[in-house]
């Protein structure tokens, strides 16, 4: 513990040292109800063993106190790899290694395994946020790591980090906006004819395959449902020769601690569950997160992971559906490109200069890509 900028600074290895009331109280001041920054979600990641020292995520949360009041905080991890981040810096690590330098460990401010934009520098005001950034920089110097990375902050926070000397990087995701549609057909009516026809054909294929779908709200999800979803989730990772990041204990924990934010879509055929999609939502935003299947049916992924959640958004008046990382195919289903941000600080001056030049070139490519995507707007009004 030390006193800096009129705040007491604590660096803790467990979120419980900050406490749920203090953490969620500070989060509530950020102006958006982001479920992934909630104590319940982060605590579930840690306590389930999904994001912990053994998996390469060593928590090192920073908390700034004004007296007994939590004035600022951020989720920070010491990492020895770049898995589960969705802002790719593997090439940077390779370049360090080729020059005989160590890229790991590094500091990462992010929600593990979650490419969702939201507040990262939690603070009661802009002055406390500025102090938090200074403490973050001091922490990097004290721990002698190669770099610090803040992933998916809102643009306002990203610009403040840029003003503090961080390098800014941008990316693209695809989000759907609810224009107060009366129903799914009203949404379809706004799309180009070809897009509308393709979506109806995809939904028809699923129905003709004898598949039915049911939506289960968080409080109604049974242990059997969770076991089945986890089986689907793990099966899909195995099919891609990958190791799943999350486990059954994590899913059960969020189901118990934040049921009002959970929706599970289960696909069944001949009375047997064959696939499932898990989304997380607030009153105004839905986030597509996890999908898996144990039996393949053409177009079922689109039905369970996109069309069912879209219908849910329309029924519940949810304004935004964030589709997750990557995926131009989402545009054909009414999702539009949205810019995301990350901020990076590298200790090695020569590499910092080289990466700054790389990011300048990359930013030009992202601008061109956004222009190209916007020209392919799937809605009828854009086509004239």
Question: Where on the chain are the PLM-derived regions?
Answer:
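N-acyltransferase acceptor-side catalytic subdomain
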Residues: 1-384
């Amino acid at each position: 513990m030390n006193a800096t900028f009129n705040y007491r600074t604590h660096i803790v290895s467990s979120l419980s040292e900050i406490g749920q009331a203090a953490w969620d109280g500070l989060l509530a001041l950020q102006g958006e109800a982001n479920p992934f920054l909630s104590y319940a979600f982060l605590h579930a990641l840690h306590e389930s063993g999904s994001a912990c020292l053994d998996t390469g995520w060593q928590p090192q949360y920073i908390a700034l106190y004004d007296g007994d009041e939590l004035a600022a905080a951020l989720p920070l991890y010491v990492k020895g790899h770049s898995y589960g981040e969705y802002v790719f810096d593997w090439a940077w690590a390779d370049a360090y290694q080729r020059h005989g330098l160590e890229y790991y460990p590094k500091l990462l401010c992010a929600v593990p395994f979650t490419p969702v934009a939201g507040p990262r520098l939690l603070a009661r005001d802009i002055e406390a946020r500025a102090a938090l950034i200074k403490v973050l920089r001091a922490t990097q110097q004290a721990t002698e790591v190669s770099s610090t990375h803040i992933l998916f902050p809102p643009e306002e926070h990203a610009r403040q980090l840029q003003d503090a000397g961080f390098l800014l990087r941008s990316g693209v995701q695809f989000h759907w906006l609810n224009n107060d549609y009366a129903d799914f057909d009203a949404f379809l009516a706004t799309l180009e004819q070809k897009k509308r026809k393709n979506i109806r054909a995809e939904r028809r294929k699923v129905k003709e395959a004898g598949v039915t779908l049911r939506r289960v709200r968080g409080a109604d999800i049974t242990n059997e449902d969770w076991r089945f979803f986890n089986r689907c989730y793990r099966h899909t990772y195995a099919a891609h020769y990958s190791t799943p990041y999350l486990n059954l204990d994590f899913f059960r924990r969020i189901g118990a601690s934040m049921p009002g934010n959970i929706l599970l879509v289960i696909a069944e055929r001949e009375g047997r569950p064959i696939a499932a999609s898990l989304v997380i939502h607030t009153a105004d935003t839905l986030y597509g997160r996890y999908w898996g299947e144990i039996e393949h049916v053409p177009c079922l992924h689109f039905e369970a992971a996109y069309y069912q959640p879209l219908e849910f958004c329309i029924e519940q008046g949810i304004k935004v559906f964030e589709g997750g990382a990557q995926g131009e195919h989402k545009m054909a289903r009414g999702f539009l490109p949205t810019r995301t941000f990350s901020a990076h600080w590298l200790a090695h001056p020569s590499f910092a200069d080289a990466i700054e030049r790389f990011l300048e070139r990359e930013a030009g490519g992202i601008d061109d890509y956004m222009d190209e995507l916007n020209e392919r707007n799937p809605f009828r009004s854009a086509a004239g």
